[in-house]
Amino acid sequence: MSKVPALLKWIGNKQRFAETIISYMPEQFNNYYEPFLGSGAVMAQLLYQNSTTSTPRFTHSYASDILPFLIDIFNIVKYEPQQIKNYYSKEIEDYYKDPNNKYNEIRDRFNSNHN
């Protein structure tokens, strides 16, 4: 089975173990609840597997995390992917126009809020 690449690098990421974790789940169930979303590795792998089979394992999935910004990131990916594409297209375009200035801008932004 293909592994889904991680959207985020995250401490405690379960990407390496996602398929093993999933192997302990029942063959079919109604709802999947992910209480500690983090990078979303297990959920992403499970959703991928569910979408590539003729007999889906589950019908609904729900994710939560104590960090609201993680949920915000995943909601943007799910509901507004064009917004992400536009943002990074502009960032890349600005970088190619003036690499030193863009590097300094990104570095300063990171150093001021660490994300």
Model-derived regions, located:
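S-adenosyl-L-methionine
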Residues: M1-L37, A41-V42, Q49
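Functionally constrained cores in energy, signaling, and assembly domains
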Residues: A18, N31, A44, S61-S64, ...
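Short catalytic/ligand-binding loop motif for oxyanion handling, primarily in non-cytosolic enzymes
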Residues: A41-Q45, L70-I73
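Class I S-adenosyl-L-methionine-dependent methyltransferase module
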Residues: N50-N115
